[in-house]
Amino acid sequence: MLHAVNGSRFTVAVSLLLGPLMTAPVSASTMATLRPQALQCLQAGQDAACRSALLVAETLQRRAAARNAFPCQTLLLGLQADLIMQQLGEGRGDQAVADVGATSRGCAGL
């Protein structure tokens, strides 16, 4: 479970949004798995795709951190923020979609 920093509303919001996902099983968590789910979320606003993409992105960003692949981890954290904002109805549109491609390129081989 994510740990909240005192006074951080964003951390609390992320904990509430991701908390239920932390117990869901994740099969092959790869960028190839994440990309179509993230695009479905960002382009079509499909809530199930958003939840699934968040779970895969969380697994991948932890893997990136464990490998000291910090630029990739940063891209994945940004993508997670885009997915959460989409769920909240405040998505960044075309820029968020473009960021999926940037994340795929920046995390190739993860």
In which residue ranges do the predicted regions lie?
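Classic N-terminal secretory signal peptides
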Residues: 1-28
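Post-signal/leader-peptide non-cytosolic segments of secretory proteins
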Residues: 27-110
